[in-house]
Amino acid sequence: MQQEAAQRESEELQHVQWRPRAVSGWGVPQLLWYLVFLQPIITEVHLRRRNVQFLFIRFSAWQYAGTDKLWAGLVTTLCEGIRRHYGALPFSVYSVLGNKPATRQDCCQSEWHCRRRVCLGLLALLAALGLGVGLLYLSLGGHALGHGSPSGSLLKVFGGAATTLSGSGLLMAVYSVGKHLFVSQRKKIERLVSREKFGSQLGFMCEVKKEVELLTDFLCFLEIYQRRRLRVVLEVTGLDTCYPERVVGVLNAINTLLSDSHAPFIFILVVDPSILAACLESAGNMKGTADNGYLFLNRTVTLPFSVPIMGRRTKLQFLHDAVQSRDDLLYREMTRKPWLPGDAGGESAQLLAVQAQAGTERGQGRIDDEAARRIQEALFCLHDERDCLYEYVPDNVVSMRRIVNTVPITVRLLQQQQQQGDFGGPTPRQAVAWVVLANQWPCRLSWALQCLEDRQQTGGAPEGRARLWDVFRDNSRELHTMTKALQNVLDLDGDPELFERFLGADFPFTVAEAQSLLRCTVNLDHSIRRRMGLIRAVSALKPPSPPKSPTRDTPHAAHRANSASRAPPSGRASGQAGEGHHTGDLAHRGKLWPVACALFRPGQSSPGGP
């Protein structure tokens, strides 16, 4: 935006004779002169100007998340940002002596009009002050010469009155400017918010609206003075971390600021639309207005913009930047200088103690150097263009930093585990891949680990070289029946197809590697596995089957006895026996069919079915 604004201004200045005025440095006295004695006029020339200057102000909602008046924080941040950019003195002078820009209906091209009332009033005050001072001087001079008379007393009275009135007028103006100079709009609004009785009244919003209108008029004055259009861009971040009612308050404040069609404000909401829509729908004071949060956003947002999918180079650059931000973990141990012991004082005991301490430190230094090398290798795999691991990292900077911050801890724990006897453990590349797996698919990974743990407890654990993907695939249908109970946890997972490609092809972790890495995992919530274990244990409990009726079994027994008495020779008997066994097998399958049918949703075919 700044580049576009600079290009527009350069193109505009090639066709006009005027140049923009400065509002800082030596331009401040001229700005104060215009503020006091001249009134701006909105002309056609000003409306045709194409050069724009953007003023960016960032508002982080989480900084004001603890207050009930989050929208008041938005307004105070806006006022404070403009005051800090243009200075407190010009805004204070405009608050006391400034005048709202006017619109002329005639064809006059002059952008400034002399404020005759201000000039005449100031001249009158100065004349009265000079007259009063002169009268006091004459009265005091005559009294000093010894010519005391009633006329001298009269001159003293008139001179004192003129001096007092004119001086008090000037002092009041200076006092008002000084008051606005030290008491900013932010302090005013915060003082109004602290009044609970006043905050619940209609006059509270009226006072805030007046402050915003004053701010808008000041920006319009600066537009005409600088000879360029001004746009204040307010970046609202962290709104998805606030309560729904406070989110609604911020949106109402934005609508209030944008209610004026000529308001020079641009609001950029950096937020997930789904979270914002859910906040609007769950807010109690928006019932009937925002029952559908997306429709409410369509009525409010004038330019929806979704960030496109991050490209390969952009993702690698972000990952590289995230890794470079953790240089303290990479090179802190590598740049350590070996400590050389000094003079031991000649005592053998102290010398042996110092040498033992130095040997211990050298051994610890070698361990730290090896850990730093492994961390560097693991993080390099994360943003290596020739590796496929970066494809599984989400296009979210927060998730990238979470993964980068977790890798050093995991690698150090893995190194400590290998030093204790597990020398053939996973590599640094497998460690960082495991961190990505736990970050992207915590529910599916927890389910595979829970199924593996249950099989170990029942004595049917798979071999160590068996793939973790096979364990998950064999129990995926059971996970499908628990989607309702685990819906919130399943929402944490990423793309299921990427999960299959991750475990099935690119990173085929074995059961032994998974068990080794599980002891070093710090970014996986173990409560998910405990919850899955409880749900699985409850679903395994089956009600006892009802007892068989003896009256039903008697006819079947008699029928079997009659069939046996009428049995043909051996060859035919064997054939009927096989047929009877097949019939019993079908009956047995018929009993199991309702249990198997419960694993599928309506409309889903059974395994092996058509």
Curated annotation (Swiss-Prot):
Region of interest called Disordered, as start-end residue ranges on this chain: 540-587
Segments forming domain KAP NTPase: 1-414
Entry superkingdom: Eukaryota
Keywords for the protein's UniProt record, in alphabetical order: Membrane, Transmembrane, Transmembrane helix
InterPro entries in alphabetical order: KAP_P-loop, NTPase_KAP_P-loop
Localisation per UniProt entry: Membrane
Gene Ontology cellular component annotations, sorted alphabetically: membrane
Range of residues in the leader sequence: none
Record's bilayer topology term: Multi-pass membrane protein
Coiled-coil zones: none
Record field: transmembrane: 22-42, 118-138, 157-177
Protein name as annotated: NTPase KAP family P-loop domain-containing protein 1
Organism of origin: Homo sapiens (Human)
Lineage: Eukaryota, Metazoa, Chordata, Craniata, Vertebrata
Gene this protein is translated from: NKPD1
